[in-house]
């Protein structure tokens, strides 16, 4: 009996989606009979576990056994991040430019069909941008006026001047919103990765310094807004990087 146990030590939605294609490939092409997610995996949001893994028909649920964790931002030419992770786990379906996979079927929500929505939320690094003016200037130059902005969830965010706020109670209804909206604009975060999983093209805004690994979907348009960092911001960035070197990877 050939068994693969995957451990994911980065807890974001996008982080888990980067591995979401592996159970299917392991069983269809890797000769694995069983694929598990280790219970030592980190989840920032319990909905991530439900959406990404519990609905995955190729996963044999969870195990208390330790699993294999691999991650790298150094992606060779001709691969995206999901391809690189597949190969790192000893798997290969001989396809490239993989997209993340989920098995939830999003519902069409009439209220969002004609809406252009901007999601200001992010948790990790979205490049060297942090000020509202940068995002607002890009929208203005592009002639785009968002109909609504997602509610700030409590992490970091780059809000714009938009009076209409919208929110969803869970990741499943957030999928419905992404699927239904006329257009989605977001930062480099799990929003774009989730959109790729439901085959929804979106526009991802990011700043200078964001690794190519996170611009992983051929469905999306990625817009580099350069940098708006001040000298003080650059000092803070350097200090954050030094701290990250001594923190456990799943806590970043």
Predicted regions and their residues:
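Catalytic machinery of carbohydrate-active enzymes
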Residues: 1-252
